[in-house]
């Protein structure tokens, strides 16, 4: 595959791959390698006048590295490199693109433990979850490698032997803007469909979790992708705005909060750019009295405490039918108290640290506000200090279950994005449907019941894009993920995502003479 020439300003340090020093526990790693990546290599901005800000390890609260943020010149360099890569990549057949993607998936599997450890160190989630996130990233790339080989259009026969056909074509340079809760997975979920369709991508991770996206960039390059196919630029709001407003960018895909999503949509509209928005949620989980209680409790825990509760699709409004509330609460509180909190790099840990001190404080304030508004704390909701002294400054809290919640409480109306479960009671199906849909958000919803007719009837009437029956937070890459209402536009994963990373061209072919009115 032809390599494109890339010019870097003098003083930039370039290298393709830096092996990480492996660590056995939290608090032992310092990252000194550059975290920006374009022109097929890491880019050091130390000789460029650019901002630098600290990145913290959530498990210990110590500084993990310093982030060099990208300004206008750096963003432009990355986009220009992506534009050059696009011209090469779009001309390859679907099979040729698939080979590169499958090799990237193989390299991810080979480096699974290393990537998972880096995700834990930068994000704070448990190593058990991080491994599953890396697996999801790999599976998404494998899935869309298959889609790359089957991209096709439609043939339409017209009168007189004439015909028309359609063809799917890439946009060009796509921008991906990731969230801090699934850094590596989101980078893969956004890049896989983009490059399968023949696009290139410039990806901006959250400044809180900048470390692992650059590993994916290295992996794509090692797999045989042209330099510039997947680039990483670091920074915050200013860098994101530069990307969204860049005239050479044709598509923006964002995962994050509703307010930021609205700003991105507004910026993209100035250039009439396509957007995919995966935004917030305040999702309902409905548990009927005929449910298998054991599975319902498991589902409620999965719907609230994965990744320390920092999951946009979490079912944080848990509606439980009145007759089974005592049994449900007894069991869910018992299991919540038993959740192992501590060093996220230890296999026995089930809940690690929240992503930042500011976010931890915000979640704890929500718990205090819930108590002030009349909710009852059945367990948790307090700062937690693990026994290991090196973790004393980490961002930990005990998972919280709130009872006596009502629909008008702040904890029920606003997305907390932490390990806080709000339990509400209901009596009838019609009542719970009305209350469950009383939200501007519609990302996800779930129902637990043994009545198959009721299950499908309730799901049909729930205003949410990603729904679950007798399970929760299951996101196989083969099926689309995304929301209704203010929770977003477009979908991640599944075959339909191809439509959000490509544009349709119609070609009409005349086989006879031209009829003219003139």
Curated annotation (Swiss-Prot):
Pathway: Amine and polyamine biosynthesis; carnitine biosynthesis. Disulfide bonds: none annotated. This is 4-trimethylaminobutyraldehyde dehydrogenase B. It catalyses: 4-(trimethylamino)butanal + NAD(+) + H2O = 4-(trimethylamino)butanoate + NADH + 2 H(+); an aldehyde + NAD(+) + H2O = a carboxylate + NADH + 2 H(+). Keywords: Cytoplasm, NAD, Oxidoreductase. GO terms for cellular component: cytosol. The keyword NAD applies. Its EC number is 1.2.1.47, 1.2.1.3. It comes from Danio rerio (Zebrafish).
